[in-house]
Amino acid sequence: MAKTVFITGASTGIGATTARTAARAGWNVALFARSEDKLAALADEIGGAALALPGDASRLADQEAAVARAAEHFGGLDAAFANAGRGMTTAGTVEGDTDDISSMVDLNVKGVLWTGRAAIPELKKTRGTLVLTGSAAGRRHIQGSIYSATKWFVHGYAGNMAEEMREWGGRCTVIAPGMVDTPFFDEGKPDKLHPQDVADAVMHALEADPRAAIREIFLMPQT
């Protein structure tokens, strides 16, 4: 029976590339993001192994409903990839727009928490894996960066969840990439990491032998 992974932020970039990669590896993919059109197009591209689940990752109710539907549709859940996230238009505690700050914190912090809260009950049944998109920015101090601070949270949460989940045979991995060439940036970054690099890291964490707990994968561009 094919395994199933729930992916937030699945419509573009790292999420979409991970979905394609997982499907090629024989996984079912539950695709969660706000863009219904992009999700539908990706699900059509992947075929029967994909299920489009539109919703807002910063809303717990949306994620809980999506996880429940995915588990019912595919017969369970083996992994969840909390990938949804965003940056700020103008960085800085004083300079940044307050609504922009709130929206980013809701998605980058609460969105990750809600993926864990929604998915853990299903993952306990399969001794599954929770994967989080962290960042190289969450491993060092960056002057005035609130985005970086949200990623510090992700890294701390990942470590805490790894300890909690090991009690019932589950695993938690944080993927910490440097700059990735995705729609996150207005201009292309051809000399940086490709979304495929991150997708490959996610799959390595998901498909590692159960005896191995991969806590963190740190990726940086070679050039």
Which stretches of residues belong to each language-model region?
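Conserved glycine-rich Rossmann-like NAD(P)H-binding loop of the short-chain dehydrogenase/reductase
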Residues: 25-42
